[in-house]
Amino acid sequence: MIDENFKKKLAVSRERVEDLFYFENSKEIGRGTYGLVYKAVPKHSNGRFPNKEYALKMIEGQGFSMSACREIALFRELRHPNLICLQRVFLTNEKKVWLLLDYAEHDLWHVIKHHRTAKTKKVPIMVPRNMVKNILFQILSGMHYLHSNWVLHRDLKPANILLMGDGGPDMRGRVKIADLGFSRIFANPLKPMAELDPVVVTFWYRAPELLLGAKHYTKAIDVWAIGCIFAELLTAEPLFFCKEEDIKAQNPYHYDQVKRIFHLLGYPSDTDWPDMKKMPDHQRLLNDARNEGTPIQTFPNSLQRYFDKWKINSQSSPYRLLVKLLTVDPLKRVSCEEAMNDIYFRKMERPPRETDDVFNRYPIPYAKKEQQITIPIDQFQQQQQQQQQQQQQQQQQQQQQQQQQMQQPQIGPPQMMGQPQMGQPQMGQPQMGQPQMGQPQMGQPQMVPSQMGQPPMGGPHPGVVAPDGHAHQMMQQQHQSQHHMQYQQMHDSMQGGMDDGGPQAKMMRMGNVPVGRYGPMGPPYGPQDFHAPQGPPMMQMMPQPGPSGYYQQRPGQPPGPGPQGYMNPQMGMTMGMRPQGVPQQAYMPGRGMPPPQGPNPQQQQQWQQYHR
C-alpha cells in the first residue's frame, strides 16, 4: 500500500498537461485505436521541451488499460527512424493518460485522398512513382524492424502511416509508422492470437487467412496490408474496397471482403494455398457463395486486367513486387526484408534510404491536418445541434400548417400560401377561364416560372396544401428524401471509390450531388427518357440552380432542383418539372387531373371544372 501522504505530495508535484502545453483551439487532428490526438506547442521555452509542435494523444477511459500499457511499453523500447517517437507520458490527477509524440503534418490517407479528388475532377495527378518507391521502402524498413523484434503491428492502413512536413530539415518528408494500440509480441505466445484479439486490421487491409478465421497468424498479415497500401498508392483507390457494415463484429470473417479478394486474385487452387481448406470459415464461405448463387470457386485471376487501366504492365517491377506482397498463402508471402531487396528498388539511380525526403525537396502540395479541420470540436458540435434544432422547428411548422389546412373545408383547389382565394383575383393573377402558367396562348409571351418558390429536394412546396388524404404521403416523401441525402453523405464519405472512381467520383462528375440509391440514376448515367424535354419547346422549364450542393446545370442533364432518380408514380414526370402554382399530387402531364386517391367525388368534380 502506498502511503496517503506520499500520494498527496505526488498529486501536488505532478505536472499537468494543461500547464505545459497550448492546445491549438482544442482541435482533434486524429484518432488512434484507443484515443484522440491533439496538436500542442510548449508554453515555456525553458529547454525541457524544444519549441516545436507535438502530438498529444489522450487515452480514452480511466487509468491504464492493457492496450495503453502495451503501446507505452513498445514505444519506450523501440527506436527506429521510421517509427513515431514517444517523448513522455503524463498521468493526471483525474486518472487520464496522455502520450507526448512527435507531430507529423500529413498522413497517407489525406495524400491518397488528395490525388483521388484530383482524378475525379478529371485532372489526373497521380502520386509520383519515385515518391511511391520511397514511401514503400520506408514502410518496409520500419516494419522489418518491428518484425525483427517480434512485434506485429496488426493495424496497418494509410491513416497510420504519417509523413513529416516542414518542421525540421532533418525530418522533412520522412515516413513514420504510428498507432501501436493493436500491436503484440508474437514470440512464443501463451495463447493463439485469435483468442486474444479476434478482430484485427481494418477490413480493406485484412489478410485472407484472418478473414477465414485463422487461429494462429504471423507477420505475413502486416505484409498483406503493406501490399494493399502499395496498390492504393499506385492507383489512388483502395484495391479491395468493400462495405463495412459490420465493422464492430466479433468475428473476423467477412464474406463480401473475401469475395472481393478472390474476384481480383482468383480462387486459390490446392497448389496456390494448400491449407485454405483447413481454415475454420472455409466451409462457411462456400455455403454463403452457394446461397448467393455466386460461382466463387470459378473466379479467375483478374488483377492484371485491373491494373491495365492504370497503365501498369504485368511485366513491370512494381506489379511483380505487388504480386509477391499479395500472395494468398501466408507461407509463400514475401517478407519485409525480401521485399526491400527486390529489383523494384535496385533499379533506382541510388538505393533508397530510410531517412530520405519522400518529397525530394519539392514544395509539399498537401494540406496540413489542422487546415482540414477548420473549426474547433466544441464549435462544430454546437453548429450541429443548432442545425438539428432548426430542422425540428421547420418540421413542426410544416406539420402544423398541414394540420390546419386539413381541418379547414376546401371548396376549390388547393391554393398557394399568400395567394388570393377563388373569386378574389388580384392584378396580374389569372382568373377562371384564363390561361394558367405554363399554358401560353397564341400571341401571348411565354411565362417562365420564377426560380424562387421551387420545391427543395424535389418534394412538395411548403406552401402547397395537399388534397385530403395525401398530407401524410407528402410528409413521408419529404422525410424519405432527407433520409436518403443524410445516408448517402454519411456512407459515401467513408468510401474511397473503386474502379470508375466509386460513388464519390460519380457524385463529382454529376455536380457533387448525392444520387438516390433506390431509384434509376439520372442521365447521362441512366435512362434517356428522363432526359427528354418535358412538354412543347415553348413550355420547357428553365434550369433551376437550387441550393448549394445541388446540381450545377450542364448539357445532358434535366433541369430542376430535385434529386435525380426519384419518380412520382402519380405524376409521370421528374419531380421539380411541374408548372408553378399547381400542387405536386394533383398534376398530370397534359391536363391537371386529380390523384387516384384522396378527394371525395364532389371535390373531384370541382377539380375537373377548375382545370378545364
UniProtKB/Swiss-Prot annotation:
Region (Disordered): 403-483, 543-612
Compositional bias segments (type: Low complexity): 403-455, 472-483, 543-555, 564-573, 600-612
Enzyme Commission no: 2.7.11.22, 2.7.11.23
Top-tier EC class: transferase
GO BP of this protein: G1/S transition of mitotic cell cycle; protein phosphorylation
Keywords: Activator, ATP-binding, Kinase, Nucleotide-binding, Nucleus, Repressor, Serine/threonine-protein kinase, Transcription, Transcription regulation, Transferase
Recorded superkingdom: Eukaryota
Molecular function terms from GO: ATP binding; cyclin-dependent protein serine/threonine kinase activity; protein serine kinase activity; protein serine/threonine kinase activity; RNA polymerase II CTD heptapeptide repeat kinase activity
Catalytic machinery residues: D155 (proton acceptor)
Catalysed reactions, semicolon-separated: L-seryl-[protein] + ATP = O-phospho-L-seryl-[protein] + ADP + H(+); L-threonyl-[protein] + ATP = O-phospho-L-threonyl-[protein] + ADP + H(+); [DNA-directed RNA polymerase] + ATP = phospho-[DNA-directed RNA polymerase] + ADP + H(+)
SUPFAM superfamilies in the record: Protein kinase-like (PK-like)
Pfam families, A to Z: Pkinase
Family named by the database record: Belongs to the protein kinase superfamily. CMGC Ser/Thr protein kinase family. CDC2/CDKX subfamily.
Quaternary structure annotation from Swiss-Prot or TrEMBL: Component of the Mediator complex.
PANTHER family with a match to the protein in the record: CELL DIVISION PROTEIN KINASE (PTHR24056), CYCLIN-DEPENDENT KINASE 8-RELATED (PTHR24056:SF495)
Role according to the record: Component of the Mediator complex, a coactivator involved in regulated gene transcription of nearly all RNA polymerase II-dependent genes. Mediator functions as a bridge to convey information from gene-specific regulatory proteins to the basal RNA polymerase II transcription machinery. Mediator is recruited to promoters by direct interactions with regulatory proteins and serves as a scaffold for the assembly of a functional pre-initiation complex with RNA polymerase II and the general transcription factors.
Annotated protein name in UniProt: Cyclin-dependent kinase 8
Organism encoding this protein: Caenorhabditis briggsae
Phylogenetic classification of the source organism: Eukaryota, Metazoa, Ecdysozoa, Nematoda, Chromadorea
